[in-house]
Structures are given as C-alpha cells and as structure tokens.
C-alpha cells in the first residue's frame, strides 16, 4: 500500500545517522508525536543540503511543537555520515540536529510513493504524520525545487490546532488568525468578519 492522506503511515525501521553515529530509527519510536518525514534524492547534490540544513536549524521549533523531523535518502548510512563530516562551505552538511535515514533497499521510498524506480532515487516528498500514525499531509516536489520549512511548521501547527479545537482553518491561516466553526450556521461568523 502506498502512503495516503487519512491512512496509517507505512511503518519503517532504518539505520540512520543521528548525532554523528549510526542508530536504528523507526516510526514507532515517535508514536505520540507529530513526524515530518522528508525525502531527498541524493547526498552530495545541490538542493538537498539547503533543505537538510534549513530543517536542522529549525529542529528546535518543531520540537517545541511536539514534532520530530526525519530526512530519508536512498544513499547508504556511510555516505550520509561522510556528508555530515564535510563543512557547509564545501557543500556538506556539517553537524545536524535531525536524523538522516538510509533507505538503501528503497523500501521506504517505495512505500511512500516517492521512488523513481529507474533512477533509484526519491522525489522530494514531505509527509506529516500525526501522533496516532495517520498521514495528514503529503507534498511531492520534482527534483529541482526545495521545500519551505516555515510552511511545514505552519502545517504541523494547523493540524494540531484542528485536532485540539475542532475548528477548520481558512486559506493562509497562521497561528492566532481567525478560524471557522464547521457548521453552516456557525461558519457565517467567520465569513461575515472576513468579507466586510
């Protein structure tokens, strides 16, 4: 089964680079937290380090929201470790604050529907998985375009808000902005205020 919104996320257990050493990382390890699972095509390329570094630098913001960021690549754990040992000025990652999962057998990329089979690399997929293990959001970019950290964080906050408060969120919602009560009668309050 390929990953789908509103369905249980495919489980996994992979060797990862965590704080400069190899460790086993599984989805089950993060039960009870939101997980932002992102895929990259290849280590030692051009867009990928910009994404990993940006998400790594925002790791604390995600943690504060009860979320864990994970990045996965079809590269080996050895290649990913070597990449973290190269300075950022030279296209490396340097020390990072998020796990890098090695999907060497491509099962994770395949299960999440991002594997380009003939090339053996993953598209830039981003999946938000809730504390119950249900996929709440999927985006998949073509290879040349990176993702937006602020948007990923906003989406985590948005799903947390709806889970807690039962309201729905309009286009361009940000924390603190107006929400919509999801009934025909109650929603009028939002629409009247938004369309003065």
Swiss-Prot record:
Record EC number: 1.11.1.24
Key words of the record: Antioxidant, Cytoplasm, Disulfide bond, Isopeptide bond, Oxidoreductase, Peroxidase, Phosphoprotein, Redox-active center, Ubl conjugation
PTM annotation: The enzyme can be inactivated by further oxidation of the cysteine sulfenic acid (C(P)-SOH) to sulphinic acid (C(P)-SO2H) instead of its condensation to a disulfide bond. It can be reactivated by forming a transient disulfide bond with sulfiredoxin SRX1, which reduces the cysteine sulfinic acid in an ATP- and Mg-dependent manner.
Cross-link (Glycyl lysine isopeptide (Lys-Gly) (interchain with G-Cter in ubiquitin)) at residue(s): 14, 89, 132
Domain Thioredoxin: 3-161
Residue positions, PTM Phosphothreonine: 174
GO MF entry, a single one: kinase regulator activity
Chemical reaction(s) catalysed: a hydroperoxide + [thioredoxin]-dithiol = an alcohol + [thioredoxin]-disulfide + H2O
Location of the protein in the cell: Cytoplasm
Amino-acid positions noted as binding substrate in the UniProt annotation, renumbered to this chain: 45-47, 124
UniProt enzyme class: oxidoreductase
One GO cellular component, as annotated: cytoplasm
Pfam families membership: 1-cysPrx_C, AhpC-TSA
Consequence the record notes for mutating residue 171 to S: Exists mainly as monomer. Has no peroxiredoxin activity
Location of the active site: 48 (cysteine sulfenic acid (-soh) intermediate)
Subunit structure: Homodimer; disulfide-linked, upon oxidation. Interacts with YAP1 via transient disulfide linkages.
Note from the entry: The active site is a conserved redox-active cysteine residue, the peroxidatic cysteine (C(P)), which makes the nucleophilic attack on the peroxide substrate. The peroxide oxidizes the C(P)-SH to cysteine sulfenic acid (C(P)-SOH), which then reacts with another cysteine residue, the resolving cysteine (C(R)), to form a disulfide bridge. The disulfide is subsequently reduced by an appropriate electron donor to complete the catalytic cycle. In this typical 2-Cys peroxiredoxin, C(R) is provided by the other dimeric subunit to form an intersubunit disulfide. Present with 378000 molecules/cell in log phase SD medium.
Family of the protein in this entry: Belongs to the peroxiredoxin family. AhpC/Prx1 subfamily.
Designated name of the protein: Peroxiredoxin TSA1
Species assigned in the record: Saccharomyces cerevisiae (strain ATCC 204508 / S288c) (Baker's yeast)
């Amino acid at each position: 089964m390929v990953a789908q919104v509103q369905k249980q996320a495919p489980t996994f257990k992979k060797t990862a680079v965590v704080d400069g050493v190899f460790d086993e990382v599984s989805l089950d390890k993060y039960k009870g937290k939101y997980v932002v699972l992102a895929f990259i095509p290849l280590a030692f390329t051009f867009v990928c380090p910009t994404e990993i570094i940006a998400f790594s630098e925002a790791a604390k913001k995600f943690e504060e929201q009860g979320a864990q960021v994970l990045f996965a690549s079809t590269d080996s754990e050895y290649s990913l470790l070597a990449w973290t040992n190269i300075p950022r000025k030279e296209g490396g990652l340097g020390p990072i604050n998020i796990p890098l999962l090695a999907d060497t057998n491509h099962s994770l990329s395949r299960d999440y529907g991002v594997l380009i089979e003939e090339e053996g690399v993953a598209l830039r997929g981003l999946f938000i998985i809730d504390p119950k293990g249900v996929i709440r959001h999927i985006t998949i970019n073509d290879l040349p375009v990176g993702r937006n950290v602020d948007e990923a964080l906003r989406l985590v906050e948005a799903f947390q808000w709806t889970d807690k408060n039962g309201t729905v969120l309009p286009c361009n919602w940000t924390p603190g902005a107006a929400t919509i009560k999801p009934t025909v009668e109650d929603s009028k309050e939002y629409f009247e205020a938004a369309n003065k």
